[in-house]
């Protein structure tokens, strides 16, 4: 089904606004994926804040022109699904995890921080823990010396308390 000019402009405007807010774009070929599998992928993506779209490549190229994702315009050929996310790793994680279980989804590349990523770059990005996990790990590292000091002081107080009880 072909789109008229106003519908094409609406699609371009929508994708342009997605690209302006997003940190990451992941591009994957979806040839041969069943509707049920594609629905699972979309539900998983939506739950993680990733916007997945199947777009005409010419419209996608126009939408990302002048943005940080312009570096992957040459990769936009064939039947592709585009994943935009505001979280730096969410789109890569969703697509890479799905590609592990479904060999028909082929990651073609992506972009992050204005740089084009190849397949290995997307997979490496997917292996990075999420922002929340990294913040939790940082808090744990910061709390570790404090909690160790508290344990040592508690042990000293208990030992001193035993010494006073034995003297009495």
UniProtKB/Swiss-Prot annotation:
InterPro entries documented for this protein: Ribosomal_uL10 (IPR001790), Ribosomal_uL10-like_sf (IPR043141), Ribosomal_uL10_bac (IPR022973), Ribosomal_uL10_bac_type (IPR047865), Ribosomal_uL10_CS_bac (IPR002363)
GO molecular-function terms, A-Z: large ribosomal subunit rRNA binding; structural constituent of ribosome
This protein's UniProt keywords: Ribonucleoprotein, Ribosomal protein, RNA-binding, rRNA-binding
One Gene Ontology term from the biological process aspect of the record: translation
UniProt cross-references to Pfam families, sorted A to Z: Ribosomal_L10
Assembly and interaction partners: Part of the ribosomal stalk of the 50S ribosomal subunit. The N-terminus interacts with L11 and the large rRNA to form the base of the stalk. The C-terminus forms an elongated spine to which L12 dimers bind in a sequential fashion forming a multimeric L10(L12)X complex.
Family named by the database record: Belongs to the universal ribosomal protein uL10 family.
Role this protein plays: Forms part of the ribosomal stalk, playing a central role in the interaction of the ribosome with GTP-bound translation factors.
Protein name in UniProt: Large ribosomal subunit protein uL10
